[in-house]
């Protein structure tokens, strides 16, 4: 039986490129090499594409993907050279220039099927402010928030925040993930400092009401038919689940399935599917919720390319539902091919 080529794109230009490498290494080990051969391309911080490795069987435990330390800029290729007939691309890229619709548009221009959400849903879901506004219309509950756009009146934005929200608040770049650039503010001085920090990553800033809540996550898989997982809970040993805690210090554990009432579980799964459809989602996503002591549910964000390491919540949620990591990859390839065929048919 001939194998299908699975092209892994990893690295990227965003601050989340290190997470991308970890995710891609997990994917390359989980692939069913009876069905696929894998070709990998590293995207450097400057945006160059470099062909790195090929795998026809499961790599050894000590084999790592090539990164900035092991590739040479002279090996850069034209981005369009990744094209291969009958291949499917898995863009294991996080953050701006990865899951914001940019790479998705590029792959559609090349007429390459790819894993994950399309251009529109990727770009909308990447922007936390746009996501908030769309989900408001869809009737999905969220915490109160204000917005600051660089160039607007900062004093007016601070005053609005002080009027509408109470401390603590969380200040977030609108277009970053993995908690990059996010900080907690306990007073006006910290609020201003947090805005300054967030502006280093984006010109659009979201300021959210802090809530005392459990963090519960639901996995999503599908195109027109949307499947969801039982929720899992992030159990933290730190006050704020930031980038350092998530990927460097390993100060979190996960409770799968989450210990929540059946009615809460059912409602979260319904909200996750509703949000996914409202944003035009396809392929996959992870929906993150807050659950307060009084039982209030708030959708925090919808992540269209969740972390894919072997210890990440998304694959673990599906494994709890009986779908192995390897089978998740197969299903995502099928869904990506299905969306490609649909896009092509709509052009006729």
Swiss-Prot record:
- For binding ATP, which residues are annotated in this chain's numbering? 162-217
Q: Which domain of life, per UniProt?
A: Bacteria
How is its cofactor bound, per UniProt? Answer: Binds 2 magnesium or manganese ions per subunit.
Q: Where does Mg(2+) 2 bind?
A: 301, 303
ATP-grasp domain mapped to chain residues: 132-334
What reaction does this catalyse?
Answer: 2 D-alanine + ATP = D-alanyl-D-alanine + ADP + phosphate + H(+)
* Primary enzyme class: ligase
Job of this protein = Cell wall formation.
Q: Which HAMAP family match?
A: Dala_Dala_lig (MF_00047)
Under PANTHER family, the record lists: D-ALANINE--D-ALANINE LIGASE (PTHR23132), D-ALANINE--D-ALANINE LIGASE A (PTHR23132:SF25)
What protein does this entry describe?
D-alanine--D-alanine ligase
What organism does this protein naturally occur in? Streptococcus thermophilus (strain CNRZ 1066)
């Amino acid at each position: 039986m001939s194998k299908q080529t699975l092209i892994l794109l990893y690295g990227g230009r965003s601050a989340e490129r290190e997470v991308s490498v970890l995710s891609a290494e997990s994917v390359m080990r989980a692939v069913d090499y009876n069905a696929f051969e894998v070709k990998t391309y590293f995207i450097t911080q400057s945006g160059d594409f470099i062909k790195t490795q090929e795998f026809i069987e499961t790599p050894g435990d000590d084999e790592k993907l090539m990164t900035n330390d092991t590739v040479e800029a002279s090996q850069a290729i034209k981005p369009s050279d990744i094209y291969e007939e009958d291949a499917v691309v898995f863009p294991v890229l996080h953050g701006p220039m990865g899951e914001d619709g940019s790479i998705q548009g590029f792959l559609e221009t090349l007429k390459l099927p790819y894993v994950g959400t399309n251009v529109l849903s990727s770009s909308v879901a990447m922007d936390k402010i746009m996501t908030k506004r769309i989900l408001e219309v869809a009737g999905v509950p969220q915490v109160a928030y204000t917005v600051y756009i660089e160039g607007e009146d900062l004093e007016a934005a601070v005053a609005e925040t002080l009027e509408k929200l109470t401390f603590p608040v969380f200040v977030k770049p609108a277009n970053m993930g993995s908690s990059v650039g996010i900080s907690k503010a306990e007073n006006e001085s910290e609020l201003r400092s947090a805005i300054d920090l967030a502006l280093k990553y984006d010109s659009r800033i979201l300021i959210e009401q802090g809530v005392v809540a459990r963090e519960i996550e639901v996995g999503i898989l599908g195109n027109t038919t949307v499947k969801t997982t039982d929720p899992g809970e992030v159990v933290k040993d730190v006050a704020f689940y930031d980038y350092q805690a998530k990927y460097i210090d390993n100060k979190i554990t996960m409770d799968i399935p989450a210990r929540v009432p059946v009615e809460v579980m059912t409602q979260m799964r319904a909200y996750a599917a509703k949000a996914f459809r409202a944003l035009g989602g396809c392929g996959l996503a992870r929906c993150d919720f807050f659950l307060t002591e009084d039982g209030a549910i708030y959708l925090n964000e919808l992540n269209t390319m969740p972390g894919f390491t072997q210890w990440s919540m998304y694959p673990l949620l599906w494994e709890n539902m009986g779908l192995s990591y390897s089978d998740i990859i197969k299903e995502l390839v099928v869904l990506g091919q299905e969306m490609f065929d649909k896009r092509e048919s709509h052009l006729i």
